[in-house]
Amino acid sequence: MDVAAQHVFLFGDQADAPMPMVRRVVERSRHSKNLESFLQSAIDNVQLEVARLTPAERDTIGPFHSLEGLADSLKEKSDRHGIAQMVSVFIARIGELILHAENDPALLDSSTPLLSLGICGGLLPAAAVAAATNIHELIEVASYLARVNCRVAVAISRRSIEIESGPGSWAFSVLGSAVAQLPDILEDFHREQSIPRHRRAWIAVSTPTWATVFGPPSVLSKLRETSITLKKSDAAELPAFGAVHAAHLVAPNFGDLVGESPLLNRPLKTGYKLLSGSKYAPYNATTLKDLLPQIMLDIFQNETNPARVFDVGGSYLRKGGPISLYMLGATSYLVLLRRSLHTQKFEVNLKTNPPSLQNSELRGGSGSVAVIGMSGQFPGAASVDELWDVLMRREERHRKIPIERFNADDYLDETGRGSSAITTAYGCFLENPGLFDHKMFNVSPREAMQMDPGQRLLLHGVYTALEDAGLVTGSSTAADNKRISTYIGDGSDDWRDLQSQHGVDKYIVQGTQRSFTPGRINHHFKWEGATWLVDAACGSTASAVGLAYRALINRDCDTAVAGGANIIATPFWHSALSKGGFLSKTGGCKTFRADADGYCRGEAVGVVVLKRLEDALQDNDNIVSVIRGYSRNHSADTVSITRPHVPAQMRAYQAVLHNSGLEPEDISYVEMHGTGTTAGDSAELESIVNVLAQKNTRETPLVVGAIKANLGHSEAASGISSLIKASLTFRKGMVPPQVGIPEKMGSFACLDHGTVHVPGAPVSFTRESVGKTRAMVMNNFDAAGGNSCFVLEEPPTPSLKSADPRPYHVVTVSAHCQTSLEENKRQLLQFLTENKETSLADLSYTTTARRMHHTLRSAYTGGSIQDIINSLGRDLGKNHGQDKPGAPRVAFAFTGQGAHYAGMGADLFKVSQPFRTTITGLQKICVTHGFPQFAHLISDPSTPMENVSTAQIHLSLAALEIALVDLWKILGISPDLVIGHSIGEYAALYAAGVLSATDAMYLVGTRAMLLQDSLEEGVNGMLSISGTPQDVAAIVSDESVMADCEVACHNSPGMVVLGGRRPRLAELEELLRARKFKCKLLDVPYAMHSSQLDTILPGFRKAARGVCFGTPTIKVISTLTGTEQQHFDSEYLVRQTRESVKYTQAISHCLSQGLVDSATLWLEIGPGPVCLGLIRSNTNVATNLAMPSLKKDDQNWKSISSALASLYVAGKAIGWREYHSDFIDSLSLISLPSYAFDNRNFWMPYTTGGKHQDVQPISTCLHHLVSQDDNGKEQSATFTAVVSQPSLLKMIQGHKLSGITVCPAGVFAEMALTAARYVLTGGSFSAPVPSLSVIDIQIDHPITPQSGSQQVIQVNVRRPKQSRDFAVSIVDQAKPSLITAKCCIRQTDEQDVIATRRQQLDMIRPKISKLMQDAASGIANRFQGKLFYKLFANLMDYGGQYEGVKEAIVGDDFTEALATIRLPKAQDSNESCTLSPYWIDALTHLVGFLLNGNPMNSGDDVYIGTQMERMEILAKDFSPDVVYQSYAYLEPSQDSVNYRGHVYILSGDSIVGFLEGARFRKMPRTTLHRILGKAVPPKPAKETSHPSVEATAPATTNGRSSATNAQAEAPAPPVNGSNGHRKTVESVLIACLIEETGMEESEILPSTFFAEIGVDSLMSISILSEIKNETGVELNASFLMEYPTLGDAQRQLRTLERKREGANPSTNGTDVAVVVNGEKPAKPKRECNVVLMQGQAPEDSSSIPLFLLADGAGSAAAYIHLPKLGLEDDLAVYAVESPWVRDPAEFTCSFEEAAALYLAAVRAKQPRGPYLLGGWSGGGVFSYEVARRLLAAGERVLGLVVIDIRAPSLRPNPHAAAPTMDIIDQIGMLSGIERTFADDASPEAARLKRHMLSTVTCFSRLVPTPMPPHLRPERTFVVWAKKDVLPKAAYDQLPPGLDAWFYPASHDMGPNGWDELVGDAVEYSQVEGDHFSIMTFPEVTELGRVLQAAVAKCRV
């Protein structure tokens, strides 16, 4: 009989390399369901534990969702505390054991004796085996122990950090003879170095031949440096991260680490032996709960000897038998164990790396998904709450199609025969679907208009749903931004069809292509999860929710946002569905009714937020409903694709019931699809009855309903609408009544059994009324044959909440803009006023931890809801300004001694776990040093202070301040600067990373004990003196007064503290009080910072030498030196103890050095606001910026809350999650008013294709009546005019401004007049023309005709009854949110007009006479008509029909004129006008001539009419057969920019019309062209009298220098107006913003953020390039990012202007031309655009810029993210763009020809060397060639920087494939473009891709020329990206040759060919990331550092 094998499990320790183990188990998990299940369960448990850590601890681990994700922190070396290491090793070891157990299940039962050997952390996985008898139990137990293991790792980390927080290893190993000498070596070292007990090194692991020494890294380093024996020994540093096996350190609470779980009571296997590493015998335990504390004692405290463990282990094995040794994870202990077993004569069979034999599939369970948030807009309901009201009121919301969508009457044809006919004019519509807060979502108005309204509304909807869910990205494991996915259903392209009327805009793709909707959502919210756009017709949103459900269950994401929208914008689908017979002709959906005749189209927007149920419960979410199951199938056997199929629907119900584990009778309600079509309703009801409600199967009828009867069929959004209604029934506990019931029901045979009930009244739907857990089915099907079905269940019953112990709370409100902020506050105030019973704690929790926060903020603190109401009421309406706070600096001020009191932190100690843990932990450490206990001084207000020792006071103060630092850090507040007063400096040094917490407490305690032991209390004391600064200074300098005293503290200019003997201080107090000084003898036992302390200094110096001093991580302002201190040592602390406190000097230093400013936030760390008073005495800090952490007479939470509120309002990011984490069991998310969006209307009506297209136009300028209404209170009408109508187009084309066709003001006036006339006469133009005046016509947005698109102008007229005034607004339908023009048309009394004209005539007669006399005497100018219009052509180019002026007399100063006018006769017989625009212009444009026809005015400026205050020109008064005169004059201008003029029209001796208040604005002609959206036409060359400046820069021709061939043309300075450069640059900037974004000028305020109006990096470059072109001012490409608001930019522009004026005073205001031989050189056909990316353009030759040549895509945008490359702001960095970046198809030239153009661009910017050149990717190759040519021309090249591209080969591959778009895509060259653009089909992306292909094609023909040895750059740098773009396997399939032009091999970071071109002297660097990610955040930061270092090496 064979001898049974004995099993030994070997678990190494936590220092073993984890990555091989991790990779192995992850790979094997693909084939093992058991292992896959364990890995996920273990990670889930670890995530729960990590969620409880501090933010700093979480940051070291990083976000993770898998074992490999956890291990990433090891690869990235962020796991400096070893937490991820220890957890990863544990999980990997258990994973390997699972694989072994699958191969041999007997391993885990008790049938075979089993011995486990583990070292240190390896004991924990061994413990899991002790309590598991099979794989299932092992997975269960080990998953929990993974969490325990994490706690242990964190405890090790925390204990270690308390001693020393710096980097470095905590252990080294020693081999050989030195092992025996270690105890003596350590003892001598500790004594000689005065190492305090807590910092001593110790022997943790030992064997006869080697040992491991542990200790703080700095101590170990010093030990190895000073010990001769260790230097000679074989000692090696180990990867150890903390203190283990340390008996001298305080042990953590093992009970807390073990935790609570039923698994802990599991009995241990009797045949299983686990040896203790310290007792060398099996642990004596019966349950896990007994075993784990013993294991932890061995890990944390007890030394171990592995050799002895292994030797003893052999005694428990049967002698002579074979041993199966299972190495569970690679470990170095294997050698030692095998040696031991071999010595004991055991035969060892080593078992490693077993294959998985598991073949069976384990069902993971269907899972459940929680709906945690909802939002929606529906017909008649702007929110989910309003939807419920609509349902309960039985409202049916159909109505006639609103005219804003399209004119239904134009398309209605009940026969349906017309090409676009609709058979019904009804639908269910949203109110105001065009409203959108574009600024909130950083979208420009121009782009917003192109966006599908569904896309816009879904952005609102997602935001609102997130608020409802309380979801803040990054706030929990399930809310990790990398794991949030978006699923959107959409089935309509209406908006794209509508936009096609108006031509194609640059934003049309991302605005109307449906895939952009989920992409834009993820982009805005910064989510990295997958995005899905689903088009399944009516099943789109149901399918989207179904996909989201499955993704959550499959763990493809952790949170999902799902929903969709349906917006009706055109008649197309109405027509198509009408013709298909789908639509009801009589109105709404009549679900279940006998008169059902089709469905009614509806609109809706709906969004839900989903999480796995367990995650929702863990995150304290409000669960609205639970999705238990989902199924989807297709009706494959139906007779028609659009016809429902009963069997298929039945199978869908059956499948979802099976998946959910429910029976039909468990379902109480069905939310049906219910469209109201006979076939659909009948089939759906039949299938429901057959599966869910068969006869005699139910005790109560199954209730059914359908939302479509209320809201119509919202098509793609129908599924989400039904889901929201269904979820509301759970929330409300009620099924709403079905609309139309009880009407006559349809004939449904399946309902005859009475098992189904359609409710005509509300039905209770509570758990009590249903009698069981509520569950329902939600059904949805689509016209394409798909069936979707969900089972929903009520949410779990929430647990009862305990009361929140905090008496004070913070409530926050924030918004993106001031309007929204005020409305948010108003809504919250109203809510609280109406709901005063609201829990204050829940309100605080909801507004802080569960809301997204914006830049504009308000915060309120209080102890009751009424406090918050009062604060809100006082704050509401206050003008807080538009400024958005940045991130101000935070200064921590640490309190010194004397401010203590009993119970300083009692409230925090009682309920704040982090605070309490810090205090108790520090006390434990202090006790080990022999210091007295002190925690009661902090925690107990009743402590009698008279019995408290100095040591207790000092220790309690230091501990309190350290605990506050830790607490503030957890809350997200870390200082930028610290300053400590006296003893407060120790905690300040802890905050700065100079001292560890343990060292700080050791020093404070030692210092205090020395005081107590060496000095007599009460002999000396301290006296505080306050007075005027002058008086105090005089006292301090008076030797007689200061006799026997010394200044201990300089607290402020008017306050010092003296130290000395008490009798002398008493005398001094009496003397100074008599001199009116304020004096106070302080209650302190010693005279600190005085000579009394000299006695303790030697002892303190010795103690201080034993601690480690780190380098400050932040600024430390020393109150010893009064300056910033960067080096600290023991001597510093000795001086700090003895010398005076220089607080005044320290604060003064902060101010003078700019370390603090008026915005700095001061937070006092200590028991009270002592130092804040001193700071206020030294500075002018505002009260709200100076905050105490604690205050003696205030509850701790009150002062903490108040400080948090101030910090929050100032813009700091608060860790609200951590703030509430200890109290989560007391808090609930509550429903509050949703965000108040600052909306603007972006709706555009559809106008094409209706019947009105054939109707005769009303007039030439006003074509069609769209709608007219008279409601008794107001008359209104809407008209349209089509610009392309020939007569109107002719009028417009005859009116050109500066060569650009612009619609004249006369056309707008005529439109307004005719519209008012139409309303007054009822459209009867045969009636007499009423007397009408045009009042205050303003033109804000000119209209220019657009070719290739249907341009429609809309005219809106309103007149209140009993009013004479019509309000008229005119808009371009392509931009309906922008008012083109507006005016008032007033019905006038002719008698009043006559009287007015008489007065006017009296006023102008003398002026006319005087002007005629001047003309007769030759003073005034007389112009005939032709000359008049020639002069006017400076601005105006009129068609012949406008030229009515025959002669004009113009005053000498061009301020007045008199013209003779003959009105042109109509040339078009079809022309019909109330008042012809030709006539209006001819009669009035004389006033414009005075400005624009003046030959003395600069041709660079024009004067544009902006407003006409009043115009009265009656059509009946005028005739082309009468000669008229017009007199015009200008008022004096106040600013030379704005002008006002008047025109009076005379016939004979009477005024027959006038125009008063014609306003003009002066602007540069270039700005006009920008506003009108046209390129600036070339100006004719002018001769100049200025001296020419010859360019002498050499250029190269065929490698030779030439001084004449290529000259650099310097850009001319901008033309100066009255404000010089600033006016020009600022005005061009604003004009560019208006054009690019579509904003109105009035909307672009100084506070406007460029990002929020849609200015991205590409648009920024475009704007700055235009500024350069038009003004000559060159700004770097990051200018609009560095100065993110208009105000910031304007201030910087003014600063630059002042510098420019100071540098060039002689050229200010002059034109400078750069010429050669008197003529400007002709510009080359192709030029590179050179973009200043950083710094300022060099002003002299001593400053050398860096030129970066564009990559293969050709754009400068590639370099936009580079950080500053100059050590200061002295380096100009230029990006040289490709000459073909705008038209890449033209890039067909050779490499040499392209390089010549780059060279010319570099030369033009910098004519002479030395040069700095470089480039990324293809730009690196071009930069090489440019450098080669410059060197050949004799120039000096300081440096060449090539970024991540191989050198072009000297030996091209003859078999290389010809480049194609597919090939370069395959090799990854387009990856960067695809990452940048969400849609790679966008015009910008397509253009860059085409350029990339052109570049590759150019390179494919390149054979480079190497540089000769004597002509090479002085330094060459090559930078490589470490990661591959493609998976390694993908490279095997690449076409030959082309890949050589891209990535280096991942293992080859060397020359890659560059050494063949530039020689061997190349410096190589590597940066994290792949080829494309290194150019974006965060990897670009590291690249920036490399480039900065390279540039620094090249500076001369």
Curated annotation (Swiss-Prot):
Residues 1263-1392 are annotated as: N-terminal hotdog fold. Residues 891-1150 are annotated as: Malonyl-CoA:ACP transacylase (MAT) domain. Non-reducing polyketide synthase; part of the gene cluster that mediates the biosynthesis of the meroterpenoids arthripenoids. The pathway begins with the HR-PKS atnH that catalyzes two chain-extension steps to form a reduced triketide, which then primes the SAT domain in the NR-PKS atnG to initiate three more cycles of extension to give a linear hexaketide corresponding to the polyketide part of arthripenoids. It is an enzyme of class 2 (transferase). Residues 366-794 form the Ketosynthase family 3 (KS3) domain. This is Non-reducing polyketide synthase atnG. Residues 1725-1923 are annotated as: Thioesterase (TE) domain. One of its GO terms (biological process) is terpenoid biosynthetic process. The lineage of its organism: Eukaryota, Fungi, Dikarya, Ascomycota, Pezizomycotina. The gene is atnG.
